[in-house]
Amino acid sequence: LTVYFGKNGEGFADVEFSIYRIAEISQDGSYTLTGDFKNYPVNLENLTSSGWRALAQTLDAYAARDHLQPLQVKKTGQDGQVVFSGLSTGLYLVKGEQYEEEGHIYKPEAMLVSLPALSEDGGWSYHQKVYCKFDSPETSSEFVHRKE
């Protein structure tokens, strides 16, 4: 699994990413929570794209709250890519640390990635490349004063 984190073709280097295996995948493509995630009260069925996004955020929050240990932790190279290898089939939570550049903070959104995934030709793809979505609120050195 290759994860890319960058903007306008420029990769963000030296950003730490963690990966967690959250579910097993069956022959019919359904998921069953596993490991540290098996007792969390979440639904993995009939999700829309916004539902998958919300699920990733929820599982990210559980992992942080419960101090779960990731399966692997790696940093992006100069090209903004990090490769997680040796992964078995299943559903994975991928989360990254923020990156700061020229007064902007880029925080990658947690995401869920299935291995294998359905490829464009309808077959199964075991070699995925995913691109991080991110929020980039501006940082400021000015203080905001609130009137009392």
Please give the residue ranges for each predicted region.
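Solvent-exposed loop/turn and edge beta-strand elements of beta-rich ligand-binding domains
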Residues: 1-148
